Curated annotation (Swiss-Prot):
One of its GO terms (biological process) is arginyl-tRNA aminoacylation. SMART domains: Arg_tRNA_synt_N, DALR_1. It comes from Haemophilus influenzae (strain PittEE). This is Arginine--tRNA ligase. SUPFAM superfamilies: Anticodon-binding domain of a subclass of class I aminoacyl-tRNA synthetases (SSF47323), Arginyl-tRNA synthetase (ArgRS), N-terminal 'additional' domain (SSF55190), Nucleotidylyl transferase (SSF52374). Belongs to the class-I aminoacyl-tRNA synthetase family. PROSITE patterns: AA_TRNA_LIGASE_I (PS00178). Keywords: Aminoacyl-tRNA synthetase, ATP-binding, Cytoplasm, Ligase, Nucleotide-binding, Protein biosynthesis.
Length: 577
């Protein structure tokens, strides 16, 4: 049930009948103030201008041809030509009842697509740090949402699992006569990496051996491939622990690292040469793009193969786009990475399209995000200025949540208390990020994110638990409740019903734009509207049984919507708090 979409289609039909072009847009939006209705159509004036008509006169023509009697109880022309739409309470009751009985709360799957979502993407032989948090949780929320909308989602964890560093690591492991790579902890690997780099920089014989191992690895040498596989496996086991703690849906089967595309790179570069897109420049192969200019105003050169024959990230990203279209048969590919990679992605995809590897119908979308900052406004670091490990951040979240819950004199069992601590601790970190517009930087603040007030995980989780407590106080049979009639008479009931039916609008926006903060804002508004409804409209102490059951139905759909919405964000709920 997408009210905005339904109204847009019907008003556009009326606009076309009234003389507007088929390309017109009704521009239907939720109204900001009750006196302007529940929705407004703002596209009348632009269409009237094209036709050379008075906007208010054209608006009346649209109303004369508009079939909304079942949905709207009142339509009015306002100002220079806006159409205000007041929804019909009877229609609202019908749709609320339908949403309650539908497994997806009334959201229907439409236009199923195959969507590749590239997110998280940590490096092998290194531990995940806070810089991986945003891609991991934003990408996962969008993946969950698109699946909920009925799409076929392919998760692609584009891990950094190829390059010269593996030659160094294999050589150093051999030097240390360590045949137990599979038993090493990841922090050991990080130490090995530092030592390997030191040897590589200081010992030419070691460096030569490392370079030879890279060549052997790329050539398929069994020993080198086995050691490389161990390093990858150890890394991904540790990463999986982080994913599980974060309640992120990525698994080992979703790994599509750089190595996957490596066999494609020579033929792609050769093809770019044949097409005349890539030209030799000082021994390297370069694609010059007129669409991007360098400081001198000349076409910018993008290297696809280095002088020594090595390939670059751009070449890999071209191959990835080609693979996702040709092999995975995707309709869309979404990449969640730092804003600083925007130009790089644009250039790689421009070359991909120029080479004809994907058609215009294949959507390549860079869902960029800003940085996580400390309270000083600088990139989030440890007190000593080091990189914050993701596991350490999650440990601290649990520690702080433990203190918070222990301070609240709760009547919970130890198991219940631990579940609340885990849900609030991890949920707070995730929600604080997801509730911010992904394209902006945001300040990481423990006090704000763990607060039970404002747009935070604890507030949302408590709002859900509070509604659950209403049902714990009654013995109403769920079947009987669903069968009970719903009536909407009070303004608070009406406001809540409309907000509940706007769930799909928020969910569809997340799926289209990759913006989980829209869903967070919706859920926060819903929780606030329910709180106002609860204060002004007695439920268990309603004036009669019919009103009680009717309001319980609104409470039930609110509970289901909050739970489903938080689930799409990857935020756990608890039954008691």
């Amino acid at each position: 049930m997408n009210i905005q979409s339904i109204l847009s289609d019907k008003i556009k039909q009326a606009m076309v009948i009234a003389g507007a072009d088929q390309s017109c847009d009704a521009l239907v939006r939720q109204s900001g103030k009750p006196q302007f209705g529940d929705y407004q159509a703002n596209g009348i004036m632009a269409a009237a201008k094209k036709l050379g008509l008075n906007p208010r006169e054209f608006a009346q023509k649209v109303l004369d041809n508009l079939q909304l009697s079942d949905i709207a109880e009142k339509l009015e022309i306002a100002g220079p030509g806006f159409i205000n739409i007041f929804l019909n309470p009877t229609w609202l009751t019908t749709e609320i009842s339908a949403a309650l009985s539908h497994k997806n709360l009334g959201i229907q799957a439409t236009n199923k697509q195959t969507v590749v979502i590239d997110y998280s993407s940590p490096n092998v032989a290194k531990e995940m740090h806070v810089g991986h948090l945003r891609s991991t949780i934003i990408g996962d929320a969008v993946a969950r949402t698109l699946e909920f909308l009925g799409h076929n989602v392919i998760r692609a964890n584009h891990v950094g699992d190829w390059g010269t560093q593996f030659g160094m690591l294999i050589a150093y492991l051999e030097k240390m006569q360590n045949e137990h790579a599979s038993e090493m902890e990841l922090q050991d690997l990080e130490a090995f990496y530092r030592e390997a780099k030191k040897h590589y920089d200081e010992d030419e014989i070691f460096a030569e051996k490392a370079r030879n191992y890279v060549v052997k690895l790329q050539g398929g040498d069994e020993y080198c491939r086995a050691m490389w596989k161990r390093l990858v496996d150890i890394t991904m086991q540790q990463n999986q622990h982080n994913y599980d703690r974060l309640n992120v849906t990525l698994t080992e089967k979703d790994v599509m690292g750089e190595s996957l595309y490596n066999p494609m790179l020579p033929s792609i570069v050769e093809d770019l040469k044949k097409q005349g897109l890539a030209v030799e420049d000082d021994g390297a192969l370069v694609v010059y793009l007129d669409e991007f200019k360098n400081k001198e105003g000349d076409p910018m050169g993008v290297i696809v193969q280095k002088k020594d024959g090595g390939f670059l990230y751009t070449t890999t990203d071209i191959a990835a786009a080609k693979y996702r279209y040709e092999t995975l048969k995707a309709n869309r590919a979404l990449v969640f990475s730092d804003t600083r990679q925007s130009q790089h992605m644009q250039q790689a995809w421009l070359i991909t399209r120029k080479a004809g590897y994907v058609p215009d119908s294949f959507s390549l979308e860079h869902k960029n995000f800003g940085m996580m900052l400390g309270k000083d406004g600088k990139p989030f670091k440890t007190r000593t200025g080091g990189t914050v490990k993701l596991a350490d951040l999650l440990d601290e979240a649990i520690e702080r949540a433990t203190v918070l819950i222990n301070e609240k004199n709760t009547n919970l069992s130890n198991d219940e208390k631990q579940a609340v601590i885990e849900a609030i601790g991890i949920g707070s970190v995730k929600y604080a990020d997801l509730s911010k517009n992904r394209t902006t930087d945001y300040v990481f603040d423990w006090d704000n994110m763990l607060s039970f007030e404002g747009n935070t995980a604890p507030y949302m989780q408590y709002a859900y638990t509070r509604i659950r407590s209403i049902f714990n106080k009654t013995e109403i049979n769920s079947t009987a409740l669903l069968a009970a009639p719903l009536t909407i008479k009070d303004d608070k009931e009406r406001t809540l019903a409309i907000k509940l039916l706007q769930f799909e609008e928020a969910v569809q926006t997340v799926g289209k734009e990759g913006t989980p903060h829209v869903l967070c804002a919706y859920l926060y508004e819903l929780a606030g509207i329910f709180s106002s409804f609860y204060e002004h409209c007695p439920i268990l102490n309603a004036e009669d049984e019919a009103v009680k059951l009717s309001r319980l139905k609104l409470a039930l759909l609110t509970e289901k919507t909050l739970k489903q919405g938080l689930e799409l964000l990857g935020i756990k709920t608890v039954e008691k708090m």
